[in-house]
């Protein structure tokens, strides 16, 4: 099983920045069997450059769940799966840091 993950963030440093969106597709080797996607309130302002780049604005995030509110869903969906991402080191560092912040 593979958890194909894509995130958007407030910047490029996992120790200082936060996830603003996560999408997860669980693939069994033949097809996608689960999908999960949500905006995440980073509890900080979205830098204007990042908002222009991603299209994600403070207004979109204000009522989004905080990471601790979706953490259990993320664990349940990805448990037992191999983490796959386009830029895996970047995405994994942010997901790992968000869990460390809990």
Spell out what each predicted region is:
Residues 1-102:
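Conserved non-catalytic scaffold segment of RNase H-like nuclease domains
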């Amino acid at each position: 099983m593979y958890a194909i993950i894509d995130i958007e963030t407030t910047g490029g440093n996992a120790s200082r920045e936060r996830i603003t969106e996560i999408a997860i597709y669980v693939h069994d080797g033949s097809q996608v069997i689960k999908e999960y996607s949500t905006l995440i309130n980073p509890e900080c302002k979205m830098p204007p450059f990042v908002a222009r780049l991603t299209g994600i604005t403070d207004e979109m995030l204000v009522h989004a769940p905080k990471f601790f509110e979706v953490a259990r869903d993320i664990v349940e969906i990805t448990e037992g799966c191999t983490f796959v991402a386009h830029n895996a080191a970047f995405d994994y560092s942010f997901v790992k840091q968000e869990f460390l912040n809990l």
